[in-house]
């Protein structure tokens, strides 16, 4: 990515060894915006993984959502990429949502959408998270960002496997010039 420094990732959810509920992964931080006139938006942080469930609970922690990419500078700058969603726990849980890519300024490329978090192989299949959308290209000139790829559903040997997450939409091209970003592929079922 042509974006600025990465933002902190979300923390992982705590693991539960008793009968309580496992922690949800933290949300990744949003990328900062580019300067008033020039500058690229920062990338969004990655979402934290959900905490593992114990043998006495059927539900673990969901993966945290990825942070959104920052917008590019008003005149010239690329949008930051969205952060990837965190993975689900080893029990029934959903992968985190991918963050949306940031929009470009008047000139620049939209940031790519973050990938959806994966479901984890378990006794029950965890669903993959939906991917983030690509950011819009520059208003005058620039390509839209690509949509992220949906998270893969968790595979299991009994009961139901998890569904794959939806792919993200591609960002629109510039109002005058620019190509639209491609849509992301959906994640496969477990």
Predicted segments, located by residue:
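Long, compositionally biased tandem-repeat segments
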Residues: 1-190
